[in-house]
Amino acid sequence: MINVFSRHEKSKEAPLSFRSILVPVDGSDASLRAVEFACSIARRGHSKVHVVHVIEVRRALRLDADLTEEAQRGEEILTQAEIAAKRQDYQIDGELLQARDAGHAIVDEAIERDSDIIVMGVPYTRPFGEFELSRIPTQVMKTAPCEVVLLRMPSE
């Protein structure tokens, strides 16, 4: 069970609650764990959980290019997210997006949906001996107008 408490724990405020939670997914274990985490905190406040998968479109292609293979893979990822939510006994909605830059698309989606928080799963990677965040979570952390939670997977 996951417990989420206010950052003002000593002040006896109620646990954090959110109206709208955005969870970007890429099919990794970390992103699916983020879906489960988001559902566990959403249940507390009867929040909406919206899951997005962003297909990054190369500049050589039109933004609305037909990317059938990528779209099929994206639909599979959204199905995996729905299964993860069902394990938490929670209903989510999902959307497949095409954009030049996934980080910008995630932030734009959070703004459009008036999300209170973005929950992102990040893998534990140490490419040069140090833990390092990849481009997308770094960009979301820098530019999102709402709270952002990064859920890092444990080291293996």
Spans of model-derived segments:
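Small/aliphatic-rich secondary-structure junction motif
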Residues: K12-T68, A84-K86, Y90-D93, T143
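Glycine-rich, Arg-bearing micro-motifs that act as flexible, cationic patches
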Residues: M120-T143, S155-E156
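Active-site phosphate/pyrophosphate- and oxyanion-stabilizing loops and adjacent acidic/basic residues
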Residues: C39, V107, T138
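Structural beta-alpha unit
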Residues: M1-L16, K86-I118, E156
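Alpha-helix N-cap and loop-to-helix initiation/capping positions
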Residues: A65-R73, E132
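Active-site loop/turn elements of alpha/beta-hydrolase fold enzymes
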Residues: V54-E56, A99, M153
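Generic structural signal for helix capping and beta-alpha/helix-loop junctions
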Residues: R58-R59, A102-H104, P127
